[in-house]
Amino acid sequence: MANADLSNFDKIIVLDFGSQYNQLITRRIREFGIYSELLSHKITAEEIKKINPKGIIFSGGPNSVYDKDAFRIDPEIYKLGIPILGICYGMQLMTYNLGGRVEPADNREYGHADIDVTDDQAVMFKELPAKQTVWMSHGDLVREVPEGFKTVATSANCPIASMADDARKFYGVQFHAEVRNTQYGNEILRHFAFDVCEAKANWSMNDFIDMQVQQIRETVGDRKVLLGLSGGVDSSVVGVLLNKAIGDQLVCIFVDHGLLRKGEAKQVMDSLEGKFGLNIIKVDAQDRFLSKLAGVSEPEQKRKIIGNEFIQVFNDEAQKLKGIDFLAQGTLYTDVIESGTDTAQTIKSHHNVGGLPEDMHFELIEPLRTLFKDEARDLGEKLGMPEDLVWRQPFPGPGLGIRVIGEITEDKLQIVRDSDLILREEIKKAGLDRDIWQYFTVLPGIRSVGVMGDGRTYDYTVGIRAVNSIDGMTADFARIPWDVLQKISVRIVNEVDHVNRIVYDITSKPPATVEWE
């Protein structure tokens, strides 16, 4: 497997104790230009020594340190001489391990709280106001600090909101410094990363590209790599990166299942094959997919048919190729975290190609598996990919098949394609395309009476869905300005045949999901 050699970068590792904010800690450190990874709390001191990090962060988590099944660590980690920052549960665990006292709080704190920094020499709060607002989320608290520590901040309901042992470079904050709700959270993490850990900001995307190109070449040699292109950001970035590294040794299969957005197949071919010279086998399978979907209206059945048929088409083409040794996928770090940590509550099914026959023995190449989504986009831009491809809206594996509610027909697909294009055009004109996390149109299968000109109509309703989210686990509907919504509505009704009504979905997730099916 060709993965990044990270030995040349300063690193700060985050140990996972189950907090919903774990990924944010890693992201914040990376935003400083320092490489960071989220690792299992079960990691040993010996394994950490091999990684040679500049610092360690203990994340928050839902446990009490006194729970029978609470997450623990190898106590030898405290003897490594590496700076440690404990956040929320991480601070309580450090206290518990080092001889302090943790108790249930008299008044639990969830949400905003004001803290007072009581030590004007506290390195974590250097040059920051003595009073600041933070984000608390805890039921236990530290009642007594371990030997060698001092209290450096307090709040009304938390007598020890932050503690420090400058000699050993061990620090704790009861609040979540990684979330934006904490007023000076970024500055606190910066002080830990640069002032305490003395890490260098030497993690850059240009260095990553050079490193990956070299490693891919060493791994692949003169052999061939197969990549399934979906037209999405991740697989497209992988394709351009691999092409830069190994050129025509890369073979791509792009299956057009007839469920893509308007002009999407042409855009992918023009950009990736035309501009970047990728070797792409395009399979036109629209008729094959639509015939399989004829008469099917149940959403899970549609998903299953689309998924199975895609795998079959991909397999049919892959079987024709000779001398393929590697399969490339656009796996991101979020996929690795969600499916590979001990504290993960759910297992995410990847949208990458799966279900390959057992007799197709490929080695796996996942060049993006250490990157977050925004870093993958940054990589695409650094590789010279066009903005409209790098910043393409997220798109589900089954495509428009789950944005047409009920039975899929070519006429219904055309309505969704045309209306979705208008939505994307107007959102971009309004300068909102980078502000709204995801937006699309959906055809609910509802028809209603309308009046157009002097005649009565009985046509379809188009739904608009636009949401903001950080990680996709929860989402809130986007507050698109009324004048922008009006332009979108007028254009769709006037330019898209068989549509006479537009509705805007103002439901959050939960209780709804982002997609309608």
Swiss-Prot record:
It holds the Pfam family GMP_synt_C. Pathway: Purine metabolism; GMP biosynthesis; GMP from XMP (L-Gln route): step 1/1. The active site is at 88 (nucleophile), 176, 178. GO terms for molecular function: ATP binding; GMP synthase activity. The keyword Isomerase does not apply. Its EC number is 6.3.5.2. Catalyzes the synthesis of GMP from XMP. PANTHER family: GMP SYNTHASE [GLUTAMINE-HYDROLYZING], GMP SYNTHASE-RELATED. This is GMP synthase [glutamine-hydrolyzing]. It comes from Pediococcus pentosaceus (strain ATCC 25745 / CCUG 21536 / LMG 10740 / 183-1w).
